[in-house]
Amino acid sequence: MRATLFAGFAVLAVVAATAVTPASAQTTGGISITHGGNNLNTAKGKFSEADQAVTTLAGSASRHGKVVTNGGRNTNTALGKFSFAGQDVTTIGGDASGRGRVFTNGGLNTNTARGFASSATQSIATLGGSAFGNGRSITNGGHNTNLAAGRFSSADQQVVTLGGTAGRHGLNVVSGGNNRNAALGFGSSASQQVFTGGQ
């Protein structure tokens, strides 16, 4: 997998993972549910290459808290000529206690590279928030699409979404935007960086 996919985001994932929760669900009188994403990976023509790395880490729930972590819908495709399509998705669940509810969705993620000399990279990291005292924290990692279709195309996208904190019947909703990144025609190039942080 190309190193560019992991720059910055791998560091974020490791730091967040150690800070928030270990790789397994932590439950002490709570419920933690984790879905690892739908993941699809395709590479077809010529010098095509489609890489995909998806990591989903469960959150922690205690004292009747509930944590639901969904690792995104992830799709990755590279079809023609000198195509390359990367994709790196990391979703880390949040922390719920005292009847708090935390929902973390890793975005809808799609990554495509189609035609001649195309290249599309995508990196998405979604970190769930925390909730306690009947609070609810909802974090959505954006709708994310990344495309490079024709000629000398190249498209780059990086999205980070950090959830917030909800306490005492509070509600905290963080959505990482509707993100779309495209480079379509002759000599095209497109780059996008999105950061969304809750409190």
Per-region residue spans from a language model:
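Bacterial N-terminal signal peptides that target proteins for export
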Residues: 1-10
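C-terminal segment of classical bacterial N-terminal signal peptides
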Residues: 14-23
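Low-complexity repeat regions of mature extracellularly deployed or surface/particle-associated proteins
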Residues: 23-199
